[in-house]
Amino acid sequence: MARKTLRARRFFSLIFPFFFITSVYAEQTPVSAKTVTVEAKNETFAPQHPDQYQSWKATSEQSAREDALAEDPRLVILWAGYPFSRDYNKPRGHAYAVTDVRETLRTGAPKTAEDGPLPMACWSCKSPDVALLIQQEGEDGYFHGKWARGGPEIVNDLGCADCHNTASDDFAQGKPALTLSRPYAERAMEAISKPFDKAGRFDQQSMVCGQCHVEYYFDGKNKAVKFPWDEGMKVENMEQYYDAIAFSDWTNSLSKTPMLKAQHPEYETWSAGIHGKNNVTCIDCHMPKVQNAEGKLYTDHKIGNPFDNFAQTCANCHTQDKASLQKVVAERKQAIHDLKIKVEDQLVHAHFEAKAAWDAGATDAEMKPILNDIRHAQWRWDLAIASHGIHMHAPEEGLRMLGSAMDKAADARTKLARLLATKGITHEIPLPDISTKEKAQKAIGLNMQQINAEKQDFLKTVVPQWEDQARKNSLLSQ
């Protein structure tokens, strides 16, 4: 009976995907002659779908920022030389998607449309304006250039047109009209034999979230988004894919290891867990059917913790009470956290030991197998921890990946000890004080005072120009 109820609730689901002083920003050119069907302003759909819109808007209540680097300064060392060592906050409400990508230190402080450290692709999961630009310019046109180029055009937060074909008759009639608004996501699903247009309703519900909640990388000269699923979705499959094309996101500034940075692989880890294997979708747990004041059922678009809507989520399938299930989840979360910290400790030592080996005169040939072990260890660790909900989605897979990461890190440190001995170094390599985020950032040479000052200037001068330009072009409501 519970399963029938769940299926009935699923049928009506409407879903969204569950992750800057001068006048140099010229007037944007008018929309091209291509057919454009994406409406990016979410408030356009409020009269037609008031309950869904108001619940989506309520994601602004999820406003707390949690500083992951302050909580765990080891991360600064693991990401030395990469923008994540500057700033990494845990996710919050979809209503902050554009704000957060503007404000993070990772995107730098560009002064012109051609300035800054990151490519246009960094907007890809932040706004329905991305789908609009892809329709107007094509994928090659959208991905071309620096992140700052998109500032005056990508201004609306994640919303309706990211997940729904809002121009369709079905949507006008109140049906979900789910769609993959990113062509690269559609190609990725085809690579794992899941073409969207042939998928069932439940599969589509999770695939729409999987447009953004996935591992991806920036491919080619244009730095276009691609999912590394050609060999499969398991951590070893993606590792094999990246190794075959000799891809790295960056080189760790301490160990000189060509590194991989996992993003937010919820779709992959969910697929590996008990819920994914039984096709209990993202929607079932994070966007349940609820009743409005008149008793009408609608899909709650305030995406959040299933325990906040226990009766409408977990209780549809589970007979245990809320406290019992919370205890199980908390135990799994703690087990993953404990192993995560142990792996990080080994990796921190490995990066500093590798630096010591280089400083002692180690050759590329001597270091190659060691760096490969560090690369693989940190990749497996990162894929396990970058999905913040893995303790719920796939705890067994999380522990398996972390165990494998521990083995690889141990292999690297064993080889490093032997190599260092040949260089006359037999003592333990000391670590600097990395007990706080600030001390760890100082240890890798970051000038955080300058970085923060540049960012604040950018936010005060460039971002207001972006928003003014967007209003002039009717991309934002006045």
Swiss-Prot record:
Residues at which Ca(2+) binds: E215, Y216, K261, Q263
Binding site for heme c 5: H275, C314, C317, H318
Cofactor comment text: Binds 1 Ca(2+) ion per monomer.
E.C. no: 1.7.2.2
Residues making up the signal peptide according to the UniProt record: 1-26
Catalytic activity: 6 Fe(III)-[cytochrome c] + NH4(+) + 2 H2O = 6 Fe(II)-[cytochrome c] + nitrite + 8 H(+)
Annotated pathway: Nitrogen metabolism; nitrate reduction (assimilation)
Residues engaged in binding heme c 2: C160, C163, H164, H301
Sites where the protein binds substrate: Y216, H264
Residues holding heme c 4: C282, C285, H286, H393
UniProt-listed InterPro entries: Cyt_c552 (IPR003321), Cyt_c_NO2Rdtase_formate-dep (IPR017570), Multihaem_cyt_sf (IPR036280)
Subcellular location(s) of the protein: Periplasm
Record GO terms (molecular function): calcium ion binding; heme binding; iron ion binding; nitrite reductase (cytochrome, ammonia-forming) activity
Pfam families: Cytochrom_C552
Binding site for heme c 3: H94, C209, C212, H213
Listed cofactors: Ca(2+); heme c
Chief place of localization: periplasm
Binding site for heme: C122, C125, K126
A GO term from the CC aspect: outer membrane-bounded periplasmic space
GO BP: anaerobic electron transport chain; nitrate assimilation
Alphabetically ordered keywords of this record: Calcium, Electron transport, Heme, Iron, Metal-binding, Oxidoreductase, Periplasm, Signal, Transport
HAMAP family listed in its UniProt record: Cytochrom_C552
Family: Belongs to the cytochrome c-552 family.
PANTHER family noted in UniProt: CYTOCHROME C-552, CYTOCHROME C-552 RESPIRATORY NITRITE REDUCTASE
Function: Catalyzes the reduction of nitrite to ammonia, consuming six electrons in the process.
Descriptive protein name: Cytochrome c-552
Lineage of the species this protein comes from: Bacteria, Pseudomonadati, Pseudomonadota, Gammaproteobacteria, Enterobacterales
